[in-house]
Regions:
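Domain-level signature for proteins that mediate thiol-based redox and metal-cofactor handling
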Residues: 1-86
Length: 86
């Protein structure tokens, strides 16, 4: 993870994206927005469930690639933003 606000879970299967998100959230301040990049379709549901269980807020999910840009491995990447609450 090069940007402290980005959790790059592209190419990983669940539950790995949630594990990485939880690790990043552990040291983040209240109100921090983390962006999770993922390719596993189950990640969207799992991120939402994780956020609800911990009182965080999912701000939205959108395509990660620019329109017309082909995904590197053939799987479209998405990004979900989560605002942390303590």
């Amino acid at each position: 993870m090069s940007d402290p606000g980005v959790v790059d879970a592209r190419g990983l299967r669940c539950p790995a994206p949630i594990i990485l998100l939880a690790r990043a959230a552990r040291d983040a301040a209240d109100g921090t927005v983390l962006e999770v990049w993922w390719t596993d379709p189950a990640a969207e549901t799992d991120i939402g469930a994780w956020a609800r269980m911990r009182g965080h807020q999912v701000l939205g999910t959108e395509p990660l690639a620019e329109p017309g840009e082909a995904p590197a491995d053939g799987v479209p990447a998405r990004a979900t933003r989560v605002r942390l609450a303590r």
